Every structure is written in C-alpha cells, then in structure tokens.
Regions:
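C-terminal and inter-domain tail/linker signature
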Residues: 1-151
Length: 151
C-alpha cells in the first residue's frame, strides 16, 4: 500500500470505529493476532479495541477524533489527534470508573503509531493519551504525585 493509502486507511479507521461506533469494522481493519503494545501480552487486540470503543462511546456519545498530523514511514503511520466529547455516561476505565457523570466537554491529546500489513490491516499499535487531563476534566481528584525520600 502507498503512503497515501495508509493515511486514508488510518483516517477511515478513526471515522468508522471511534466517531461512528462501527464495531464490525474492527474485524476488517485489525489483523488476526495484532498486538497492542500498551496491553498485556496475549491480549486480543480486536476484542479489546471493541471494548474500548464501546466504553468511550457510552461515556461520550458525541465522541470525535480530530486528526492533526499523520506521518508515514514504510508500513507505519504516526498520528497526533485530539479526542473530544461530552461526558454523558459512565466511564469505566481505571481510576475513573465510578465517577459521577459530569456533563463536561473534554479535549484529550492522543498519539498513535499503527503498523499495517500488505492488506491494509493493523498488525501493531503503540499509543499514548493524556488520561490525567481527561480525569481532571471530568472531575476526578488529582492523584498524589509526591515522592517521599528516606529520612
């Protein structure tokens, strides 16, 4: 696939999966055995991605990813984006689970790196997102980040 094809495939993935909630598209877009490098070894990336999309779309029914830049080198696309949405449902992710629905509008920075196979399916994913910013925007208490030194 060309650089243009891979960028188009990346944009289509965000639009169909996250913005529209098309969970069936995950099976088309993610290769069997794909690896999400932020999850424990052996995690079924497709199943996990469906769970994350459903969780985010429940919490933020107007979920949208704005893609700012995409860079492609070989079979890898790097993408900087901002996730936006209005907190209107439960968000059961880590320490944010159980927080009351805030109604807050959120903007959260994300970085994704996707590796594609020759058929245009994701085989590897590396990603980071600013969960602290999300937690603060929906009213979660700030974590205690103090470091104590031995006396």
């Amino acid at each position: 696939m060309t650089e243009r094809d891979l960028k188009r495939r990346t944009r289509e993935g965000f639009e169909r999966m996250f913005d529209s909630g098309d969970l069936e598209y995950v099976d088309e877009a993610v290769a069997v055995g794909a690896i999400d490098h932020q999850e424990p070894e052996g995690t079924d990336m497709g199943a996990h991605l469906k769970q994350i999309i459903a969780t985010l779309r429940t919490a933020f029914p107007d979920l949208h990813f704005e893609l700012h830049e995409m860079l492609c080198e070989g079979d890898i696309v790097a993408c900087r984006s901002t996730m936006t949405g209005t907190h209107q449902g439960p968000l059961n992710i880590g320490p944010m689970g159980g927080l009351p629905i805030s109604g807050a509008r959120v903007e959260v920075a994300h970085m994704h790196f996707f590796r594609y196979d020759d058929d245009g399916r994701v085989t590897d994913l590396w990603h980071v997102w600013n969960t602290l910013a999300l937690a603060r925007q929906i009213g979660a208490p700030a974590p205690d980040l103090r470091v104590s030194a031995p006396a």
